[in-house]
């Protein structure tokens, strides 16, 4: 997910996206713990996406 795509979304949409990403991260952590996760790079991708969304939420909050 690109930051330019996220910038067009509203704060509510970003919060929904953040919630979805956190759920995905939890699922990946459970898969990793049970040794079912084959592609471990997904963990870092989701973590970076969470950081992007949180950064944009913060930027929009500061602007208002």
Swiss-Prot record:
One of its GO terms (molecular function) is structural constituent of ribosome. Keywords: Ribonucleoprotein, Ribosomal protein. Disulfide bonds: none annotated. One of its GO terms (cellular component) is cytosolic large ribosomal subunit. InterPro entries: Ribosomal_protein_uL29, Ribosomal_uL29, Ribosomal_uL29_CS, Ribosomal_uL29_sf. PROSITE patterns: RIBOSOMAL_L29. GO terms for biological process: translation. It holds the Pfam family Ribosomal_L29. Belongs to the universal ribosomal protein uL29 family. This is Large ribosomal subunit protein uL29.
